[in-house]
């Protein structure tokens, strides 16, 4: 478990892959640079995960690639290792660009690339909104081999000509279903238009609905596909329950009762709107519960410090919108509560994947009003899973 991947679940995964995809059982079989191999082993990996053993070689060959597997299976390292293999660190120009839907995820990817590339003298910059634009300009003018960023700030830096694109050979879209959603789609096309015509495109996500896959035809050429079968997508090791609360106004008392019953290492509570996050945070504090909260309208400095406190365990309960559901890795989270069921069924798996990271036990509890029953059934059907009513002994499951 040093590498943080649940190997038992990983070995059982079934893939729908393109016929040319072969499995590389070890990192040595991938013919990676010696300095990169050192970084991989120092990072804690001993052997590749299922998705890594299939996708890395294809990406390193220069093929456009679509890789889909659930949270905690090593997707970030899949494209990070591939990027580090194909860049030339002697050339101090941007050669790979990774786009993510949230600032926190872009920063996390930067730290993974820096750690894996520890012996390669790699320069990687997180180019994200809400931060000092002067720092971006200084770093980009100095020259960065890899840029990990959010679409808006990256597009801005390209337009201002501080992010030079002529040497870029790979574009990675992480959490691609979110990036190709209405909110980001135009910004992604904006960035894509500035890239050299031969740029390789890698699309990565835990969920890839058919309409998103269809959209990739606009900017991918004959992509290799490494896709986990959908009925394997709900996460092993996470027990999923619902509590029937009937009315919206009963949710708060239910949450307080739960809080009194459970010993929580760390928990994330998801609400659907920023307003609800603020309201619930105030209500919990009035009731003398210690909680922190985060949503997309907060200044970046505040978001960073809340994330740091939560990672270090200084705060135990975080109330958030879906800004936190995507790819953020905090290993101690044992409980996720969907105070509101997600309006988008793809987000369900991203949310519950925050608990039980990397094969640890986790519990997901869904608050379900009488209006929500249909949404819950839709989630069960979509993921071929069963969500049972919460048992009385839920505290034992978290201990």
UniProtKB/Swiss-Prot annotation:
Q: Where is ATP annotated to bind?
A: 69-76
- The chain positions of domain Helicase ATP-binding read 56-226
Q: Give every Helicase C-terminal domain span.
A: 237-398
GO BP, sorted A to Z: rRNA processing
One annotated GO molecular function is:
RNA binding
Q: Which EC numbers does the record give?
A: 3.6.4.13
Motif DEAD box per record, residues: 174-177
Question: Which InterPro entries does this one have?
Answer: DEAD/DEAH_box_helicase_dom, Helicase_ATP-bd, Helicase_C-like, P-loop_NTPase, RNA-helicase_DEAD-box_CS, RNA_helicase_DEAD_Q_motif
Chief localisation class: nucleus
Superkingdom of this entry's organism?
Answer: Eukaryota
One Pfam family this sequence matches: Helicase_C
**Catalysis: reaction(s):** ATP + H2O = ADP + phosphate + H(+)
Share the domain note from the entry: The Q motif is unique to and characteristic of the DEAD box family of RNA helicases and controls ATP binding and hydrolysis.
- Protein name as catalogued: ATP-dependent RNA helicase fal1
Q: Which organism is it from?
A: Aspergillus niger (strain ATCC MYA-4892 / CBS 513.88 / FGSC A1513)
User: Lineage in the entry?
Assistant: Eukaryota, Fungi, Dikarya, Ascomycota, Pezizomycotina
């Amino acid at each position: 478990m040093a590498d943080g991947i649940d190997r038992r679940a990983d070995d059982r995964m079934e893939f729908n892959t393109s016929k040319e995809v072969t499995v590389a059982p070890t990192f040595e079989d991938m013919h990676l640079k010696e300095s990169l191999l050192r970084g991989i082993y120092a990072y804690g990996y001993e052997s590749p995960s299922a998705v890594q053993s299939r996708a890395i070689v294809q990406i390193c060959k220069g093929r456009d690639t679509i890789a889909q597997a659930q949270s905690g299976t090593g997707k970030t390292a899949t494209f990070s290792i591939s990027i580090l293999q194909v860049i030339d660190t002697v050339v101090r120009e941007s050669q790979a660009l990774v786009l993510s839907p949230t600032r926190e995820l872009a920063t996390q990817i930067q730290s993974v690339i820096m750690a894996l590339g520890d012996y390669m003298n790699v320069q990687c910059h997180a180019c994200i909104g809400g931060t000092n634009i002067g720092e971006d300009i200084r770093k980009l003018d100095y020259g960065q081999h890899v840029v990990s960023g959010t679409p808006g700030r990256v597009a801005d830096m390209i337009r201002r000509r501080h992010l030079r694109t002529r040497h870029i050979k790979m574009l990675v879209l992480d959490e691609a279903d979110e990036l190709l959603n209405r909110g980001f789609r135009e910004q992604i096309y904006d960035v894509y238009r500035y890239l050299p015509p031969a740029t390789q495109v890698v699309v990565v996500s835990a969920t890839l609905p058919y309409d998103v896959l269809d959209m990739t035809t606009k900017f991918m050429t004959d992509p290799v596909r490494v896709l986990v079968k959908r009925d394997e997508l709900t996460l092993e090791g996470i027990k999923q329950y619902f509590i029937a609360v009937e009315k919206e106004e009963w949710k708060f008392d239910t949450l307080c009762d739960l809080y009194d019953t459970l010993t929580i290492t760390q928990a994330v509570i998801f609400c659907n709107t920023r307003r609800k996050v603020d309201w619930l945070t105030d209500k919990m504090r009035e009731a003398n519960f210690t909680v922190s909260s985060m949503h997309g309208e907060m200044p970046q400095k505040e978001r960073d410090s809340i994330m740091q406190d939560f990672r270090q365990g200084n705060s135990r309960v975080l109330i958030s919108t879906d800004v936190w559901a995507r790819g953020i890795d905090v290993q101690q989270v044992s409980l996720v509560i969907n105070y509101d069921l997600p309006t988008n069924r793809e987000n369900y798996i991203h949310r519950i994947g925050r608990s039980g990271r990397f094969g640890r036990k986790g519990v997901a509890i869904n608050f379900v009003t009488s209006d929500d029953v249909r949404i819950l059934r839709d989630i069960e059907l979509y993921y071929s899973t069963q969500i049972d009513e919460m048992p009385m002994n839920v505290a034992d499951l978290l201990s």
